[in-house]
């Protein structure tokens, strides 16, 4: 199960710590054992350590991870790890300071320090999410592979998806990952398939791993998807690519719905899961 989307500008619709933990507890009771906090930027919440601590304490939870831009990790990595967060995905599209600033408005140095802090705190694995953008960073994959090798991290090459962006931007920036997969196949000493992670391929190169996330026109991405998302305003989202089939769980919770009713809402969301990519 994953959290999703930017933090709400309206404090009334943003979930409290207790509400987040309650939803996760219901999910774990249904057999969901892995939770990832995403965003937006989850580290922007001042109560993020409390959220981590309370979720990690839920009996039956096997794995708790987070996707972050890494900017605030330097000061938070040790505390997050100590309170139960064990794995991290850090968004890092480039190692070029100017390109990074143009893409994000932030400082590359802050993220690089965050990567170092995460590794030193004990997080494993630490994955670097490199979203491939045509003409922006598509020519720097070899450099990123070397950085992952040097830092003991795993590089994830991620294909751009047409989500929350204009059609014009998508068509101008999207680049298929086929050529990178061909290159990785030639260099790999081993190729691993993560069946329950959309059949993703992990290429084991000497002293480094590279994972390829290829969702576009990929029927396996849907066939092997086991994820259910929760938006920051408390809606269950059955499909990453769709917004028309959300199930509101926060409103019933605030109106006093018992756990049996909330469990039924999870089952409804699961029933609404339909493949986006079809053969």
Where in this protein do the model-derived segments appear?
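A short local structural element in Rossmann-fold oxidoreductases
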Residues: 1, 77-78, 100-101, 241, ...
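Radical SAM/AdoMet-radical enzyme domain recognition
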Residues: 14-37, 45-156
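Accessory C-terminal segments flanking Radical SAM cores
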Residues: 162-278
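A short acidic, helix-capping loop that chelates divalent metal ions and anchors anionic groups
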Residues: 4-10, 96-102, 164-168, 247-248
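Conserved G/P- and acidic residue-centered "switch" motifs that form tight phosphate/ATP-binding loops
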Residues: 41
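Canonical Radical SAM [4Fe-4S] cluster-binding loop centered on the CxxxCxxC motif
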Residues: 1-15, 239-240
């Amino acid at each position: 199960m994953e959290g999703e989307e930017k933090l709400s500008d309206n404090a009334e619709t943003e979930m409290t710590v207790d509400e987040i933990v309650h939803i996760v507890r219901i999910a774990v009771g249904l057999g969901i054992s892995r939770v990832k906090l995403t965003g937006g930027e989850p580290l922007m919440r001042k109560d993020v350590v409390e959220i981590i601590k309370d979720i990690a304490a839920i009996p039956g939870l096997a794995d708790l991870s987070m996707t972050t831009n890494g900017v605030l990790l330097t000061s938070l990595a040790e505390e997050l790890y100590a309170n139960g967060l064990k794995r991290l995905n850090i968004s890092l599209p480039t190692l070029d300071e100017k390109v990074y600033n143009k893409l994000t408005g932030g400082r590359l140095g802050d993220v690089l320090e965050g990567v170092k802090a995460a590794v030193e705190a004990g997080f494993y694995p630490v994955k670097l999410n490199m979203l491939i953008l045509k003409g922006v960073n598509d020519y720097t994959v070899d450099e990123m592979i070397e950085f992952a090798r040097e830092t003991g991290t795993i590089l994830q090459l991620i294909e751009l998806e047409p989500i929350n962006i204009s059609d014009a931007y998508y068509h101008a920036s999207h680049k298929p990952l086929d050529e990178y997969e061909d290159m990785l196949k030639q260099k790999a000493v081993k190729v691993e398939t993560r069946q329950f992670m959309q059949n993703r391929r992990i290429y084991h190169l000497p002293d480094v791993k590279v994972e390829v996330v290829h969702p576009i026109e990929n029927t396996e991405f849907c066939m092997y998807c086991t994820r259910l998302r929760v938006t920051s305003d408390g809606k269950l989202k059955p499909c990453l690519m769709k917004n028309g089939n959300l199930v509101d769980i926060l409103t019933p919770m605030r109106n006093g719905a018992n756990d049996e009713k909330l469990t039924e809402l999870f089952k409804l969301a699961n029933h609404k899961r339909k493949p986006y990519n079809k053969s």
